[in-house]
From Swiss-Prot:
It comes from Clostridium acetobutylicum (strain ATCC 824 / DSM 792 / JCM 1419 / IAM 19013 / LMG 5710 / NBRC 13948 / NRRL B-527 / VKM B-1787 / 2291 / W). Belongs to the arabinose isomerase family. This is L-arabinose isomerase 2. Mn(2+) binds at E306, E331, H348, H447. The keyword Isomerase applies. HAMAP family: Arabinose_Isome. The gene is araA2. Pathway: Carbohydrate degradation; L-arabinose degradation via L-ribulose; D-xylulose 5-phosphate from L-arabinose (bacterial route): step 1/3. One of its GO terms (molecular function) is L-arabinose isomerase activity. One of its GO terms (biological process) is L-arabinose catabolic process to xylulose 5-phosphate. Its EC number is 5.3.1.4. It catalyses: beta-L-arabinopyranose = L-ribulose. Catalyzes the conversion of L-arabinose to L-ribulose. Keywords: Arabinose catabolism, Carbohydrate metabolism, Isomerase, Manganese, Metal-binding.
Length: 488
């Protein structure tokens, strides 16, 4: 299982010496209380550390330098308790290389209408400080996040939590390594891309390996290891031979287990956390990896088919953000076009991510019409329901583009007893017709990463962190705006 690294966020509070030591003591006390209460709330995925008061340019620069070199620090949350002259923030903010959230809150929820005086105003002037600080971030084009509201409010805490998850993904992105077994599927356009630019902009390392390298690792797997894993399957899944001879069924499933163990070892040796395969490049293998891929997806590995390394890396990135919950590789396959009931059916030839499963997955063995190999084993299940996003990354030659489409996953209208793959059904925003049109005009690929844990805003926040063009297709989308933005 790939575990997310332990991370923390530093809380830095803006003020100045103008107000005197007694005021600064109160600022520090209030700051410590906020951090302590936020950590106790259990509403945040990572711990917040109160670092210090920011009362001089040298102090701020010193803090930001430390943020940059401390691997465990994923980002900075700033709060302006009082007015904090923003020229002090320029040097430190310029060198900050990690995500920044400006928390526009204040210690007290209410104005003490009957007793408020200038002492109170001088101490509790976040409204004043927020605007000065916000100006310098805008001037520096920092692409920071702004969260506004009372710090005890659960919805406000959720916004901070959502940003923390994205910031953790941003940090993890620098460590994403994709192993490509074989090249891209021949003649397919959208899966191509500039690997050097992806490493510069997103931190992704993409390495090629011949399929023989994987086969060599598979050959080292012992029968005892395979048998032990097969026994574990009896508790995890429904083993369904169907019309297959039981001995043949077991043999095919165990071949996928052999692939799984060999593949995992190969990835672990090279510290890879994402990978691709290609059904056109299977020399030396008996089956296209199916169940093997799905099992590794469940452990947090990113994946995409047909050599699509961009989507595999994106899959790993979003899995970090969601702690590998209801997030995975997907492909738009076919439409339901009945008026008023339009929707898309998503699947893939084998490798649908089991983090989507709404029921206990079933292991089946069926023929596969492509790849010219033996019948592969795979997990089948119905996908979960709920609101989420479909995300596609494409290389336009001049730059990368990220397309983010809000969606609602729904139950299928009927059972699909003859479809031998896992599947998910969804309705894109703002509606089926305009959603699909917008996707096509924007150049969106047929491969996506779907997540039922992330929001459009979270994925958009990541795009801003890395300076990536984003096309948002959601409930507020106007088709003409999409056309104007994407076809000039």
């Amino acid at each position: 299982m790939l575990e997310n690294k332990k991370m923390e966020f530093w809380f830095v509070v803006g003020s100045q010496h103008l107000y005197g030591e007694e005021a600064l003591k109160e600022v520090r006390k209030n700051s410590e209380t906020i951090v302590d209460e936020l950590n106790k709330s259990a509403n945040l995925p990572y711990k917040i550390i109160f670092k210090d008061l920011a009362t001089s340019a040298d102090k701020i620069k010193e803090i930001m330098k430390e943020v940059n070199y401390r691997d465990e620090v994923a980002g900075v949350i700033t709060w302006m308790h009082t007015f904090s002259p923003a020229k002090m923030w320029i040097a430190g903010t310029k060198i900050l290389q990690k995500p920044l959230l400006h928390f526009a809150t204040q210690y007290n929820e209410n104005i003490p209408w009957k007793t408020i005086d200038m002492d109170y105003m001088n101490l509790h002037q976040s409204a004043h400080g927020d605007r000065e600080y916000g100006f310098i971030n805008a001037r520096l084009k920092k692409h920071n996040k702004v969260v506004v509201g009372y710090w005890k409010d659960k919805e406000v805490q959720k916004q901070v939590s959502d940003w923390m998850k994205v910031a953790a993904g941003y940090i993890a992105s620098e460590s994403i390594k994709v192993a490509r077994f074989g090249d891209n599927m021949r003649n397919v356009a959208v899966t191509e891309g500039d690997k050097v630019e992806a490493q510069i902009q997103f931190g992704w390392t993409v390495d090629y390996f011949g399929i023989g390298d994987l086969v060599a690792e598979m050959d080292k797997v012992s029968q005892d290891e395979i048998n032990k894993t097969y026994e574990e399957f009896k508790d995890l899944y429904i083993l369904d031979p169907g019309e297959n001879d039981p001995a043949f069924y077991e043999k095919q499933v165990k071949e996928q287990i052999k692939i799984e163990i060999g593949l995992r070892r190969f990835l672990e040796k090279g510290n890879y956390n994402a990978f691709t395969t290609n059904f056109e490049d299977l020399y030396g293998m008996k089956q296209l990896p199916g169940l093997a891929v799905q099992r590794l997806n469940a452990e947090g590995y990113g994946f995409a088919g047909e050599g699509d390394w961009k989507t595999a890396a994106l899959d790993r990135l979003l899995k970090v953000m969601t702690n590998n919950t209801a997030t995975g590789f997907m492909e738009d396959y076919t439409y339901e076009l009945s008026r008023g009931n339009e929707k898309a059916l998503g699947a893939h030839m084998l490798e649908v991510d089991p983090t989507f499963a709404s029921d206990k997955p079933k292991v089946i063995v069926k023929p596969l019409g492509i790849g010219d190999k033996e019948d592969p084993a795979r997990l089948i299940f119905n996908g979960s329901t709920g609101k989420g996003v479909a995300v596609s990354m494409l290389d336009l030659g001049t730059h990368y583009r990220l397309i983010i489409n809000g969606l609602t996953a729904v139950k299928p209208d009927e059972d699909m007893p003859n479809l031998p793959v896992a599947k998910m059904v969804w309705k894109p925003e703002p509606n089926f017709i305009e959603g699909v049109k917008s996707w096509i005009y924007a150049g969106g690929g047929h491969h996506t990463v779907v997540s039922l844990e992330l929001t459009v805003e979270q994925v958009y926040d990541w795009s801003r962190m890395v300076g990536l063009e984003a096309v948002i297709i959601d409930k507020d989308t106007k088709l003409r705006d999409i056309i104007e933005k994407t076809t000039k």
